[in-house]
Amino acid sequence: MDTPFVYDRFVTGKNFIGRKTECTIMSNLLESGEHIVLYGRPKSGKMSIVQQTLFNRRMSGRQFMVAHASLSNVRNLEQFLLKFGTAVIKAVSSTAVEYEALITKYLDGTHFVFDRSRFASCDEVVSLNWTPDMNDVYKMIRLPQRIAEERCRPYYVILEDFQNIMLAEEYDDVFKLMEELFRERNRMQPASASFIIAGSQVNAMKFIFEEKKYFYRLVEKITMSTVDDREIIEYIVKGFMVSGKVIERDLVLGA
């Protein structure tokens, strides 16, 4: 590694330390087709837990699809729908012809289109030809489930910075349509879509899930524990050793 330790992005494998319990819990929940929420301050390790869990499931031979939509710059309904749709479609196809075919197949009767000029200019797979309405939201939210059912494979949809949906005037309608979908979940169905909801603005996430009680009993919350100091120290020491340097454990402790 170029630096003693990774700190500027999510980590998996040998760079992932601690929180094995959280990974086990998340894996079991995904195996059961549950929807998951976790939140904490920025850079607290949310995405590392998610990615390590998926890494572990791949290593154990599990077959699944994954879409990751970062909502960090979402400020309105249209931006959310396009981010969501683009992530979901791109995760299961790879060419312009395939993108257009999937949008035509799954999003018929909506205002969603595949715009080749938008795709060429900004890599936008799903575009809108009109102001979105609730039918558009309804069909878009259900898109991962339809793909999972047809391909007979679980589909995990990661929504990062989920709290930003509240910046859209229609956020209440969006949440209620998501709740409707979550209530319809069939635990006996082997191929279903599971949403992994992550948020970095703790107060906003608490407002959604604890104060207003959206998704009440429809999602399972994973609480992140503090990484043990001993694991952190060992990781730092090993990181310096890889780069040919030695650091005393007492120095790491600040003694």
Regions found by a protein language model. Give the residues of each.
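A short, basic N-terminal segment
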Residues: M1-R41, M59, K245
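A short helix-turn-beta junction within AAA+ P-loop NTPase domains corresponding to the substrate/partner-engaging
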Residues: I208-S225
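Conserved small helical "lid"/interfacial subdomain of P-loop NTPases
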Residues: M224-L251
